[in-house]
Amino acid sequence: MRACLLIALTVGVVLGQSNATAAGQDEGTISIVQTDQMEWKDYPGLPGVKFVVLAGNPSQPGLYVIRAKFAPHTMSRPHWHPEARYVTVMKGTWWAGTGEVFDPDSTTPIPAGGFAIHTPGKVHYDGAKDEEAIVQISGMGPSGTNVVNPGGAKKE
């Protein structure tokens, strides 16, 4: 009985300390970026796409995290990246296709909550169809995007 009481008191003290710590957060322990603080910028060379860097720097070595916002009816053209990229769909449906010929009708829908991995050096294209899509992309920089078919020729 005494051992049970001692355990209960110990657990109560530990839980009480955890709650006290959570209530008075130590600044600098967690970096928080609220959605209303995100400064979206136009993605160079891809009208209709905006992005924000949340962590790291994609052009430098190391981990980076970005979000990209695709306006309705906006898709990238066939391209590849030198690094693996890990993509989580945050909002809407994101459409992904593979190959050097741009064929939006052959893309696969990835709804909000879905996940995809871009394999380094593999050609793909992606974007939004009828609704806005927001994706979060992470990888190890330096990142790059190499367009394969700059003219964006469609499948005939």
Q: What is each of the regions a protein language model found here?
A:
Residues A3-G16:
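Bacterial N-terminal signal peptides
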Residues G28-S31, D105, Y125-E156:
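Double-stranded beta-helix
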Residues A71-T74, W80-V101:
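Glycine- and acidic-residue-biased ligand/ion/polar-headgroup-sensing regions
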Residues P61-H81, P109-I110, T119-P120:
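Conserved short histidine dyad/triad with adjacent acidic residue
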Residues V53, K69, W95, I134-S138:
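Soluble periplasmic/extracytoplasmic beta-strand elements of cell-envelope proteins
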Residues S18-Y64, G151-E156:
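A short, N-terminal "cap"/entry segment at the start of jelly-roll beta-barrel domains
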Residues W94, E100-G121:
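Short acidic-glycine-tyrosine-enriched beta hairpin
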Residues S76-P78, A96-G97, H118, V123-K129:
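Short beta-strand His + acidic residue motifs that chelate non-heme Fe in jelly-roll/DSBH
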